[in-house]
Amino acid sequence: MVTLNHYLILSSLLFMIGLVGVMRRKNLLMLFFSTEIMLNAVNVGLVAAGKYMNDMAGQMFSFFIIAVAASEVAVGLGLLILWYKKNGSLDLDNLQLMKG
């Protein structure tokens, strides 16, 4: 049987994978994807905790996070596309060019 510990271990592993991706990648798109992995890891933890506590709050918070992540995807990908069209690269080191 799958217990709460299994879900929390999965959630923490996913979060660590996303955190390593955020710290090690220089491509803005990969940073964006790593952030999404971290948000989904939090969702797994919230849903699992809500299931084992017989409380719907975890699922409700998870739906709220999904809604926020969807708007983040819409705005973030739009900005990344514009950045790529302007500079031809999504390298994080080129972000210094935005200084006034």
From Swiss-Prot:
GO terms for molecular function: NADH:ubiquinone reductase (non-electrogenic) activity; quinone binding. The keyword Cytoplasm does not apply. The lineage of its organism: Bacteria, Pseudomonadati, Campylobacterota, Epsilonproteobacteria, Campylobacterales. It catalyses: a quinone + NADH + 5 H(+)(in) = a quinol + NAD(+) + 4 H(+)(out). This is NADH-quinone oxidoreductase subunit K. The chain crosses the membrane at residues 2-22, 28-48, 63-83. Belongs to the complex I subunit 4L family. Its EC number is 7.1.1.-. Keywords: Cell inner membrane, Cell membrane, Membrane, NAD, Quinone, Translocase, Transmembrane, Transmembrane helix, Transport, Ubiquinone. It is an enzyme of class 7 (translocase). One of its GO terms (biological process) is ATP synthesis coupled electron transport.
